[in-house]
């Protein structure tokens, strides 16, 4: 993979997480021309410059304008008359690299605090409540150089939201009581990351460079850095927050992006009105001209012990900041070649030796002044013994690039691919789009901000050679991550406790790498045959339907077809479910289905990589019902890739060496589940408890030893012997072509695997356990790795139907913001606090998910206390407030998909759940608008109140690593201080000791009836 892994080694810090479940022919450049009228804004002294020539894609119907305000804020305005949601983002070009040395995490803490009250809007949840009532949401993140705040809201309420948002940058309160509470949220956020290998490796990389360089700082912060130590040293953190904000939150370091239905003139006036008062303190842009890795930090080897059983090799070179060369992007060119996965590539050779499975190569962001070039691979057991040889191969490939010299045709191909990607770019969700653009405005001229990261302009062999010259053995840093180093390390990283050992790489090894010769196995990539050439948008057929239509229904297959009538891009989504009773019949078969598809994807990788580069990707997974295949992207060459995958499926020959390697990697991934987050464990156990048939990780591990090569070889024809295929073909494709695609898939399977249809009785889905009225069950487990508890509380309500769906969703809409405000902001139970619907197997209910240092039975009591307060809140709610919630939910539900793949995913969800309610949003919103407050109170009293006659509750308590035991229920009188609402006394729950016995004693719900009459659905 080229140019990647920025997340793995450079995670940003997202905050205020309301939801946890929470990178041809060039295009014709279209310019947004000057409007005919002279704006009233032209002579506005608050505006220094207006830029109306914003280069955009020819397919982009939105209007853009750039502004530079007199106070130095850069602005991009986007007028989109069709948008359901408006959005805005502000990016401050300051991050954790600018933290005071004695208060690590201050910039991140400042980001948290800005959400909690301003002079104009002092109520601490004013902003989040306003957004929640108007179908909005918000978030923010802090990285080394940026603090990025963003929100979305229903399009009518942009001004109200933007006014509240602007106050963050004008006059935040930094209220002392909020500060004392919110430090716990930051601490909980850090605690969540402490045992996460990505965060640990990122901090270790920072810690092993120049300790005086800002890069070495600890960016998240925790209670020790933001409260305990400052208190000991007599530092007032509130004063430091005020000082940090008044020093660095300067308009000359800010960039804003606003998207709304309003005209560009109206958006201009809005931004000028709200942001021209932000003070310009003329803060110099932080720059870091010295690289954190100097000579003494090079030619070093780091042996690192991970938390999970992973084996990775990270090879890093310090390189200069290439940002200014974005029009030629030499790092992209080298990443494209070094990270290539086709025949003759570095990865191809390392895989054939049995040393690695995956490779990522390319430039990685540092900060203004420095960057890195990385080549990262995962290691097989054999690969761990050949690290020196793997790195020698890397230098042989780099030597090949030097010997061949920069190739203009390779640059041209990258340029063409990027140009096609820009021309046919999917529309993005407003919130993500504004956040991304606000960050880019600091780096690129206003008129080129949309194109800068796509359109390559000049081939600069001199720059390619310059970067290539940095990729030498004398500049290398090597990190090996493996459990095999346990007990053999002598250093501990300060903030995460990572165990590691540092050694100088011996000079004879450096010499060996310097003498790397040319390896005849290495070849430059050949011309990419998957680059699309036909971009014709097919005319809508006369019988085109607004929703997927069933155009084929036989014993072998059901084919749903929908010609795109919204996005008009040369793309399609082809989704297939291959239903087989053999895929999940027991843990052994589940393992074999998984390994078959992993081996299949592994063998297809060289072929399919070129397609992926050309914007055509596929996904292949085993499911509890069989196999899922999707092919997405440009429709031009789609059938070629699909045919290759289907033929390979039906004629697959397993390579013995790859079988052993992939089986071993699978065993490690099963073992590594123990190190997942406590809240993820809670969700996993609940799924096992509630689903009729579900195999545990332990059962899969136990059965994996029985998977032998002969057994797997015998399983594949059995799996393919009888199938039922259900498909959705959606996009720039005709009905005739769709029927042809389906026929090709069937013919290939029949010809090569002699596939026959399944019996209708074999097509039944799994069902959900039905809890008894007034029943409350608790299941307890311990997480061996994390020192936090996790809980999922599930109130099962009923089968899915239009009415039940709306009762539940409206209740969830009403409690969502108060839940976050009460349990996270005020009570500080933890960083992860979530409430919302849970749906599985056609059954649904309300769920709460919390991760906390507090014990699970305490979290349970606080959720119950919160629910009681919500009963009163709903009873006291005005009709106007109630209607706001109905409106907010309606807007959320009717928010149109922004791209073909999102619309397709929605329809596919209806197909795999076998509900087929393609017009669900309109049908359910129409019902929603008939609901009254009394309906919701009745729903609560019948289903959710402590004494509700039809209350059905399951709680999963995941204990922290250091807790031996914990009561399942308890009273907490000492905790009930004046600020806490009283928790109700709870009955003694039934403790689940054995999952199988629990399920055996309870009935199952029936399956939901499909919404569609299949005879009528056929065209």
Swiss-Prot record:
Changing residue 374 to S: Strongly reduced catalytic activity. Abolishes stimulation of activity by ATP. GO terms for cellular component: basolateral plasma membrane; cell surface; cytoplasm; cytosol; cytosolic proteasome complex; endosome lumen; external side of plasma membrane; extracellular exosome. Changing residue 112 to Q: Abolishes catalytic activity. Decreases substrate binding affinity. Its cofactor is Zn(2+). Binds 1 zinc ion per subunit. It catalyses: Degradation of insulin, glucagon and other polypeptides. No action on proteins. Keywords: Allosteric enzyme, ATP-binding, Cell membrane, Cytoplasm, Hydrolase, Membrane, Metal-binding, Metalloprotease, Nucleotide-binding, Protease, Secreted, Zinc. Changing residue 111 to V: Abolishes catalytic activity. No effect on substrate binding. Substrate binds at residues 359-363. Its EC number is 3.4.24.56. Its main location: cytoplasm. Activated by ATP, other nucleotide triphosphates and small peptides. Inhibited by bacitracin. Pfam families: Peptidase_M16, Peptidase_M16_C, Peptidase_M16_M, PqqF-like_C_4. The active site is at 111 (proton acceptor). SUPFAM superfamilies: LuxS/MPP-like metallohydrolase. Changing residue 609 to F: Strongly reduced catalytic activity. Abolishes stimulation of activity by ATP. Changing residue 429 to S: Greatly decreased activation by polyphosphate anions. Changing residue 898 to A: Greatly decreased activation by polyphosphate anions, and deficient in activation by small peptides. It is found in: Cytoplasm, Cytosol; Cell membrane; Secreted. Zn(2+) binds at residues 108, 112, 189. PANTHER family: INSULIN-DEGRADING ENZYME-RELATED, NARDILYSIN. Belongs to the peptidase M16 family. This is Insulin-degrading enzyme. It comes from Rattus norvegicus. The gene is Ide.
